[in-house]
Amino acid sequence: MDRRLHSLRGQAALINLWATWCPPCRAEMPAIQQVYERFRDQGFVVLAVNQQEDAARVVAYMNEQRLTFPALLDSDALVGAAYQVRVLPSSFFLDRRGLFALCIVDRCRVV
């Protein structure tokens, strides 16, 4: 994950830690998709980091919901532990310098 974050330097990014079994996670996914579609051509990146689920379940959910942003698997919850995530969903915004600009716990909303 750190290598991946390093590769994002120069781009604004949303890193969202989530799970398919989490109702607030499921509720915010359409808003995240909307933001991704609106800003991806401007270099905005979304990384949905799934916590402790298998690839088949995540792929099925992403396809069912027509989510097109990248999803990464954190099967052992190492990313969640590294960023001290205690509740899902948790979202982190990185600025173009690669610095954490904002952390949101609970739900993202489009404003």
Where in this protein do the model-derived segments appear?
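Conserved redox-active cysteine motifs that mediate thiol-disulfide chemistry
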Residues: 9, 17-34
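Conserved hydrophobic/aromatic "anchor" residues
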Residues: 3, 8, 17-21, 61, ...
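A short beta-strand-turn-helix
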Residues: 1-13, 36-39
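Structural microenvironment flanking redox-active thiols in thiol-disulfide oxidoreductases
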Residues: 26-65, 75-82
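Hydrophobic beta-strand anchors of alpha/beta hydrolase catalytic cores
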Residues: 14-15, 46, 91
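Nucleotide phosphate-binding site architecture
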Residues: 6, 23, 33, 52, ...
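Active-site acidic short loop of glycosyltransferases
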Residues: 9-11, 41, 67-68, 85
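Thiol/disulfide oxidoreductase modules built on the thioredoxin-like
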Residues: 60-68, 73-111
